[in-house]
Structures are given as structure tokens and as C-alpha cells.
Amino acid sequence: MAVARARVLGVQWLQRASRNVMPLGARTASHMTKDMFPGPYPRTPEERAAAAKKYNMRVEDYEPYPDDGMGYGDYPKLPDRSQHERDPWYSWDQPGLRLNWGEPMHWHLDMYNRNRVDTSPTPISWHVMCMQLFGFLAFMIFMCWVGDVYPVYQPVGPKQYPYNNLYLERGGDPSKEPERVVHYEI
């Protein structure tokens, strides 16, 4: 009982001591100021205009996420397009992400950045890609079936052994002279 009480007191002391050692800047370690967080969902046209100005957008282009309780607030709903689709030859302020300073980022930028999902249109339509894939698989299955039904073997000659075809090792009479075996070389 005394050991358990000492253990609890030791843990409580350690928690109190660690609170005093924590650096003061630990609260702002995320580098997100309160100005960067989305505000409440805009209900009036004036609030929409203020939110559009906050995100450097025109009022006509600004559309917030729906207020469904996910916590998006007044953050603008940007098109679901990856950074691959943006012009690679433009002089971006941040070329790795293809973003300019002050430009709103997509809420799911970590998914749509250049290392992840590429939403660029493909040069071949989806049904053509499926036809090519399943056509190749069907052809390979057909060829495996043909190879199974009609097996092909490498032609071979009879096995050749040295010393007159292993005459003595195969039980030949040592007093007789074995007949000569001609070995062929290719």
C-alpha cells in the first residue's frame, strides 16, 4: 500500500515539475496564428464580402464550404484540382507548391500537392484504359491455356555417358570388349 502511494506521489510530483519546465513558446509551435484560422460561417452578404477580402478573393469567386459542422467556417471552397494542373513555367513565389504569396490554399492541400494525387485529365479515356487492360489479361489467359493444351518441349537426344556408355557400371562383362559408342558433338 505504501509503495503504491509513493508511486502515485512520484507521478504527481513529476507532472508538476514538468509543467514548470515547459518552454513558454510551446503554445505557438504550430506557427498558425489566430488570423490564419477560419472565422465563423458568413451569414450575411457583408460577412461574405469581408471573408472574400480576408482570403484575397473577389466576392463573385468566393464560395465557402457548406456549414455542415465539419469546422470549415468561412474558408473558401476551392476546386478539387491538384497542383500538377497549374502552369509549371509561371514564376511562382513558392515553386515547389506552385503557390503565390497570399493566395488561399486548398483545405486538403496535403492531398492535392504534387507528390500525391494528380487530378490532371488523362490523355486516354477511362473505358479505353479498361479495354486495354482487360484485353491484355484475356490475351495472356488465352496464351496460357494454349500452352497448357499444346505443350512444347525442347527436342533432346538420348543421354550420352562417357566410358562406352558406362559399360562396366551398368553391369557389363569386364572380360569382353564393349562395342564402340559414337558420341555426337554439336
Swiss-Prot record:
Membrane-spanning intervals of the chain: 133-153
Keywords: Electron transport, Membrane, Mitochondrion, Mitochondrion inner membrane, Respiratory chain, Transit peptide, Transmembrane, Transmembrane helix, Transport
Keyword Membrane part of the UniProt annotation: yes
A single cellular component GO annotation: mitochondrial inner membrane
Membrane protein topology class: Single-pass membrane protein
Alphabetized InterPro entries for the sequence: NDUFB8, Ndufb8_metazoa
The organelle targeting sequence, given as a residue range: 1-28
Pfam annotation, one family: NDUF_B8
Main location group: mitochondrion
Compartments reported by the entry: Mitochondrion inner membrane
Presence of keyword tRNA processing: no
GO BP, sorted A to Z: mitochondrial electron transport, NADH to ubiquinone
Function: Accessory subunit of the mitochondrial membrane respiratory chain NADH dehydrogenase (Complex I), that is believed not to be involved in catalysis. Complex I functions in the transfer of electrons from NADH to the respiratory chain. The immediate electron acceptor for the enzyme is believed to be ubiquinone.
Subunit and partners: Complex I is composed of 45 different subunits.
Cross-referenced PANTHER family: NADH DEHYDROGENASE [UBIQUINONE] 1 BETA SUBCOMPLEX SUBUNIT 8, MITOCHONDRIAL, NADH-UBIQUINONE OXIDOREDUCTASE ASHI SUBUNIT
Family per similarity comment: Belongs to the complex I NDUFB8 subunit family.
Protein name: NADH dehydrogenase [ubiquinone] 1 beta subcomplex subunit 8, mitochondrial
Organism classification: Eukaryota, Metazoa, Chordata, Craniata, Vertebrata
